[in-house]
Amino acid sequence: MEMARAHLFIRGKVQGVFFRQSMKEVATRNGVRGWVRNRSDGRTVEAVLEGPRDAVLKVIEWARVGPPGARVEDVEVRWEEYKGEFQDFRILPTF
């Protein structure tokens, strides 16, 4: 099983629409670990995903649409070296 790590920047109407909580649920359901947080610009959510490549890709595909009420304009994906540093998926404070 190929493991992967992706660093995402999701832009649009993605704050105040339960994006972080919804992403946590989707990631956990797919066995993906990492974190998600709002950025202080008010229109970006940042996330780091780690897990089996297929599962990470599923979460990225979900992020392109997001939860009801979100309007995703862009998802920037930066593939990084897998580190295996997370035990679960967390919502972090705004940065």
From Swiss-Prot:
Organism: Pyrobaculum arsenaticum (strain DSM 13514 / JCM 11321 / PZ6)
Catalytic activity, EC: 3.6.1.7
Catalytic machinery residues: R20, N38
Residues forming coiled coils: none
Catalytic activity: an acyl phosphate + H2O = a carboxylate + phosphate + H(+)
Xref: InterPro entries: Acylphosphatase, Acylphosphatase-like_dom, Acylphosphatase-like_dom_sf, Acylphosphatase_CS
Name listed for the protein in its UniProt record: Acylphosphatase
Keyword terms, alphabetized: Hydrolase
Keyword Protein transport assigned: no
Presence of keyword Transferase: no
Positions of the Acylphosphatase-like domain: 5-93
One Pfam assignment: Acylphosphatase
Family per similarity comment: Belongs to the acylphosphatase family.
Domain of life: Archaea
Single GO molecular function: acylphosphatase activity
Enzyme class per UniProt: hydrolase
Residue pairs linked by disulfide bridges in the UniProt entry: none
UniProt-listed PANTHER family: ACYLPHOSPHATASE
